[in-house]
Structures are given as C-alpha cells and as structure tokens.
Amino acid sequence: IIGLVSKRLFNERMISRKDEEIQAVQHGIDYMGYKVKRKMPLVWLFIDEAHEFLPHESVGKTPATDALVQVLREGRQPGISVVLATQQPGKIHTDAMTQSDIVISHRVTAEPDVKALNQITQSYLYDSISDKVNNLPRLKGSAILLDDNSERIYPMRVRPRFTWHGGEAPMAIPKSDDTD
C-alpha cells in the first residue's frame, strides 16, 4: 500500500506542479509576485519503521522500495517532503541516508548503524558522525542534528515524552513516586 500511495502522490504532484508552472509562466512579468493556485497541496509523507519498506540494497526490495526511492530522489521538485524514522539506520536503503537534508540521530552502538551514519559524513565535517554521537552527553534524549543546508552538525536534546508510549520497555518493579 505504501508503494501505491507513494507512486500516486508522486504522479499527482508532478501533474499539479506542471500546471502550477504553466500558470506562473502565463503571468509573465509579475512571475515573482504571482501566487500560484494549487489544485493539490504540497505533501509530507511520514513513514515509521522505514527500514521495513526501504531495506538496504543487500537485503532486497519490498513492493514499496522502487516508488519510495523515486520519491526520495525526485520528490522535492514537485513538492513532496519525506520524513523517515528508524531505529536501525544500518538496515535502511542507502538513498534514504544520502538524499536526506536533515538527519537526527540518537546514540547508536551497533556497528552496522554506526557505519551507515559514517557513510553520510559530508566533506565539510571534520569529525566522523560516530565521533559526534559518541561525544554526546549520556542523557536521555541526547542527539545530533546534521543539517546539509547549513553544512553544520548540532548537538540537541529531545524533551521527555509526556504522553503514554506503547513501545516503552516493561518494568519488573512498578515505579513509585518516591523512586524517581
């Protein structure tokens, strides 16, 4: 289903983008000041557990792989933004990593995940990404943000979750207020 939805979104946005460009060109001289009337809105596609739909090339393909890779490579021009989440960057398709403008990574320790992060090290970075991740403070929520547009890497901290979390690890001993 993800492959079909991705392909359809891509095709629809390409058609819409062409119409938007024709509208803008027809307005000629006031091109920069012309506000395009969109028939289809710009799209954000969010995919959790992305390695399940975009596995590393060495593993093979899923029915969604080709459509998602096309969106990753060509989707920016027609107005499609993609947000992928995975806890295993070593298992995700190489294009998902190399086509990313922003990468947020918490501390990773598995060797394939560290290697995957180091593969996206850009020429403007003096240290490897794994060095940056390893130098993070050992606090919950610590992460790095790699911004390809500003060509910088930023340390960051994600605030604690305030809502119920279905994926939380079970506790053998119930947590009481006085054990915080």
Where are these predicted regions, by residue range?
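P-loop NTPase motor domains
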Residues: I1-Q70, P137-D147
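Short, surface-exposed linear patches
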Residues: R8-E12, D66-Q70, S105-V108, L125-I129, ...
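Conserved P-loop NTPase motor module
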Residues: R138-D180
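Sequence-level detector for tyrosine residue identity
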Residues: I15, Y31-Y34, Y124-Y126, Y154, ...
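Short secondary-structure boundary/capping segments
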Residues: G60-P63, T98-D101, I120-T121, P160-F162
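Short clusters of small/polar residues that mark proteolytic maturation junctions
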Residues: E57-S58, R107, R157-V158
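Residue-identity detector for glycine
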Residues: G3, G28, G33, G60, ...
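Conserved ATP-driven motor cores of ASCE-family P-loop NTPases powering translocation/secretion/packaging/pilus
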Residues: V69-P155
